[in-house]
Every structure is written in C-alpha cells, then in structure tokens.
Amino acid sequence: MLNIENLKCGFGKHEILHGISLTIPKGQITAIVGQSGCGKTTFLKTLNRMVEEEGGYLSGTITLEGTDIKSLPKEKLRRRVGMVFQQPIAFPHSIEKNLSYVLKYHGVRNKKEIAEKITESLQKAKLYDEVKDQLKKSALKL
C-alpha cells in the first residue's frame, strides 16, 4: 500500500503541491492525469525521491507498505514504483490505444472492459468530455 499524507512540494518560493493526501491499495493500478502544468510530473517525482535530486523541497509523509520512502534505497524504491513521464508519446497510435497499454500489461484483454476502464478513468479525472471525440485520433497530434 502507498500512503501519502499532507504532501507539499515545491522549488524555491514556488509551492507546486499543496497538501495532497492519498492511499493506494497494494496491486491497484492508478493513473495520475490532468491538464498540463497541474503538478502531475512533480507529484510522480516525489514518489521516486527525484525532487530532492532536482533541488526541490517536500514535506509530509509518503510510506510504501508502512515504510517511510526516505529510508528506502532509491534503487529499490524506483523498482517498486512505475512511472511514465509526459515526454512525447512513444507510440504513434490513437489516444485510446496508448491508454490501453497499461491495462493490457496488467492482463486486461477484453476490448469492452478496456474501453469501459478508459472511460471510467477519464471521467474520474474530469477529462472525458474534453477528449471523448479524440480517442480514435493520433496521440501525436495533440
């Protein structure tokens, strides 16, 4: 289980994350999605202790299976927490196909179930209405 309590993070005087609290059960696949510039990458970097390498600060508590991540070797931590950064998408496919890769990786093969999970995730992130008509378009053209 990943547990985050009152996570704040920033660089210099600019605070980027403002008190995030979140619990992710062991084995649950979780996507962090949102508009450009909202702090997704910074949030993910806190989970792998990359913020400190870039001169950032953070406060709050992040524990992985009950252990504070500050006490875990970075290499071990980075093997346990998977991340995909918002660099240009590696696969020149549709948005829908790119979103389906993680589901297929975790054993979801049924096309209807994949479509439902993609829709559900986009709705939770409040992005569905924005991208629903673009799901079949190339992700490289966004």
Where are the language model's segments positioned?
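Short coil-to-beta microelement around the adenine-binding A-loop and adjacent beta1/P-loop entry
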Residues: 14-15, 75
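Conserved catalytic motifs of ABC-family nucleotide-binding domains
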Residues: 54-55, 88-97
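ABC ATPase NBD Q-loop/coupling interface
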Residues: 49, 61-76, 136
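ABC ATPase NBD coupling module
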Residues: 56, 68-82, 105
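Conserved ABC ATPase "signature" region
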Residues: 64-68, 111-133
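Conserved structural motif at the start of ABC-family nucleotide-binding domains
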Residues: 2, 17-19, 78
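Short helical segment in ABC ATPase nucleotide-binding domains corresponding to the A-loop/adjacent helical element
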Residues: 48, 96-105, 115, 119, ...
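The feature captures the beta-strand-to-loop junction immediately N-terminal to the Walker
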Residues: 33-35
